[in-house]
């Protein structure tokens, strides 16, 4: 039995608040248990130098954790003068994932910047950021099409992400911080709307894991992602 009382295949309570930020083209506050991430999507009429003159766009991402988001205050990376390796890894993951579900050729020479700010961290911040960022991106595209900045919808697919791991010998879904910090295996799965995989990250923290255990995690994660896709659709169709 998990300390939270959840079943092995049970997600934490989830909510998606649409458009909490009034200035961004799209924004979403995602809450998965006690992990809360503010996600926004902003459009700029510039592209990276390597894309200039090619009439196609780009999506990039930035990720950060507020100082009070964890039990011990995190120093602002701006004050330190450089980003940490974890921050760079996560924002690259988010950017890669978002580029998999959008046709950047249909953006024209525009760049959409995804910003993910962790307000409260209790495990699974990167997966929450990806799931919330899709909603923010969807709203941004909707806004740009309404303003006729974009003529064609460039979105190809939904995207959602969830963590899965092996904790005390049991395969479990959506690890919170206590589970994550003591897990035998910690993995993250990023899915497209049709169930195909976009990215998998898996690490054995103590002992190697078997192919059978990996497939069990994949199955559990796929079921969790299906629930996330359903929630995304519900909130977006209702907005």
Curated annotation (Swiss-Prot):
Enzyme nomenclature, EC number: 2.7.7.56
Pfam families the UniProt entry points to: RNase_PH (PF01138), RNase_PH_C (PF03725)
SUPFAM superfamilies named in the record: Ribonuclease PH domain 2-like, Ribosomal protein S5 domain 2-like
Origin: domain of life: Bacteria
Gene Ontology molecular function: any one: tRNA nucleotidyltransferase activity
Any GO BP annotation: rRNA processing
Keyword tRNA-binding: yes
Protein name (record): Ribonuclease PH
Organism lineage string: Bacteria, Pseudomonadati, Pseudomonadota, Alphaproteobacteria, Rickettsiales
């Amino acid at each position: 039995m998990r300390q939270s009382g959840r079943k092995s295949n049970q997600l934490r309570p989830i909510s998606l608040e649409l458009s909490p930020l009034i200035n961004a083209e799209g924004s979403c506050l995602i809450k998965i248990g006690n992990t809360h991430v503010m996600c926004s999507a902003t459009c700029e009429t510039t592209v990276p130098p390597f894309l200039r003159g090619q009439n196609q766009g780009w999506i990039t991402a930035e990720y950060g954790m507020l100082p009070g988001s964890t039990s011990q205050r995190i120093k602002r990376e701006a004050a330190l003068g450089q980003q940490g390796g974890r921050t760079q890894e996560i924002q690259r993951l988010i950017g890669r994932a978002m580029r998999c579900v959008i046709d950047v050729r249909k953006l024209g020479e525009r760049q959409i910047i995804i910003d993910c700010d962790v307000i409260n961290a209790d495990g699974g911040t990167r997966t929450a950021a990806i799931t919330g960022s899709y909603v923010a991106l969807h709203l941004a595209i909707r806004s740009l099409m309404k303003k006729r900045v974009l003529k064609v919808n460039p979105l190809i697919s939904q995207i959602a992400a969830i963590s899965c791991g092996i904790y005390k010998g049991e395969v479990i879904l959506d690890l919170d911080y206590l589970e994550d910090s003591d897990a035998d295996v910690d993995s993250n799965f990023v899915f497209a709307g049709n169930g195909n995989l976009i990215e998998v990250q898996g690490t054995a923290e103590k002992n190697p894991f078997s192919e059978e255990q990996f497939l069990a995690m994949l199955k559990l994660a796929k079921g969790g992602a299906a629930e996330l896709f359903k929630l995304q659709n519900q909130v977006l169709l209702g907005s």
